[in-house]
Amino acid sequence: LVNKYLETNQNSIYAIGDCSEQQEPQTGRRSIEAVWYTGRMMGETLAQTLTGNKKAYNPGHWFNSAKFFDIEYQTYGLVAAQPTKPEKHFHWKHPNENVAITLAYDENTKKFLGINTFGIRMRHELLDKILCEKKSVFCMIEQLANCNFDPEFFKTYEKKILLKFNQDFNTNIKLKKKSWKVIFNNIIS
């Protein structure tokens, strides 16, 4: 059991990774998170404390990625398996390939809450910025090309995803053109 500085109840004894349980986890985070990203972030935080710069553990928005055989899986923000109001989901699945996305959003405010992707790699920094700035699901969907992190020459699915999104929401949103300025500077308009 650790506090926000990863300190146990014993002087100068710390715990990180899945060996630690947060006494007061951040909103939307679990008290134990057994993924390597959180272990790495805890290690970076503890290194600051051990070198004289006491720092609280602040993991930010939930994210994770994994690979199931040849299928990439990524999640950013919170996407409930069974959403409860006011959370709603937009879902798109490719008819022939192992590619799908689920966008979670607040049905009242349209605030983007999170995304799960299968077969599509996403750009962490941009998605985190969209979440931190509490952008709408509409802003997120128009930024799909910039958020995509698949290697060059991979298939892209943004146009097909946007087509279904516009049909489902009765909107006429256009994709923002991929911009290295947006990608490198994390500028979301």
Predicted regions and their residues:
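FAD-site-proximal beta/loop scaffold in flavoenzymes
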Residues: 1-45, 139-148, 153
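Generic "edge-of-domain/loop-turn" microfeature
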Residues: 7, 13, 80, 122-123, ...
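Mid-to-C-terminal Rossmann-like scaffold of FAD/NAD(P)H-dependent oxidoreductases
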Residues: 19-125, 178-188
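C-terminal auxiliary extensions adjacent to catalytic cores
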Residues: 94-165
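An exposure/low-complexity boundary signal
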Residues: 152-189
